[in-house]
Swiss-Prot record:
Function: Thiolesterase that catalyzes the hydrolysis of S-D-lactoyl-glutathione to form glutathione and D-lactic acid.
SUBUNIT field: Monomer.
UniProt lineage: Bacteria, Pseudomonadati, Pseudomonadota, Gammaproteobacteria, Pseudomonadales
Binding site for Zn(2+) 2: D60, H61, D133, H171
Name of the protein this chain belongs to: Hydroxyacylglutathione hydrolase
Pathway: Secondary metabolite metabolism; methylglyoxal degradation; (R)-lactate from methylglyoxal: step 2/2
GO biological process: methylglyoxal catabolic process to D-lactate via S-lactoyl-glutathione
Superkingdom, natural source: Bacteria
Family matches, as HAMAP family: Glyoxalase_2 (MF_01374)
Enzyme Commission number(s) from the entry: 3.1.2.6
Amino acid sequence: MIQIDALPAFSDNYIWLLQDTAKRRCAVVDPGDAAPVERWLAANPEWVLSDILVTHHHNDHVGGVERLKQLSGARVCGPANERIPGRDLALDEGDKVDVLGVTFQVLAVPGHTLGHIAFFSDGPPTPVLFSGDTLFAAGCGRMFEGTPEQMQPALARLAALPEQTEVYCAHEYTLSNLRFAKAVEPTNTHVQQRFEDVTRLRAENRISLPSTIGLERLTNPFLRTSETLVKQKADEWKGHSNTSHVAVFAALRSWKDTF
């Protein structure tokens, strides 16, 4: 059984630490900074870092990769279509990778970057998703490289995963995302309740993650483009009717970019 903990980095990044407590082996996801991982390993000298998983090429996700590989000899697994430092295993849609005895399916989710991938395991005991900067808690990443035609289907695909799937995204953006979700759906009681819950967590300096796919379906406007009120708000923002899920998504994303 794998334990998952967050190692905070920079101002709002999370490096996810996967731990096989029986074998004292661990892996990390998107180590943008080596220092938090180095500190953990120094405090736990009996542990071995075996794998580094990377979702995309942005420096706040890969900045610590080469240092950690040099220190530990860990295998670096990342997207085939992006330049990932120290990469040993190039991964693309449909590939599978075994990490700490867990098999992860690789999902291509372009949009934030063109080669962005996510890692999904259906368990046991619980399905987990490492979504990088594609799906956030109550939000999604900006489209730095991709298009709405790429990103909306990618998000819809993640939304179709089992509702109990735990979502481990890479940033603590939940509260600001929920402020936007409240503007899009002011009458959504699930959004309001989540906003209150996350406000309490952050006031106590506690993290708001993981989320679940089920919770995202209820509260994430970027997964709710078929909802009448969401479409109406997107139409108001653009000043015309958006006639497809992609168009509604594009309107929401452009609104959020300036929110």
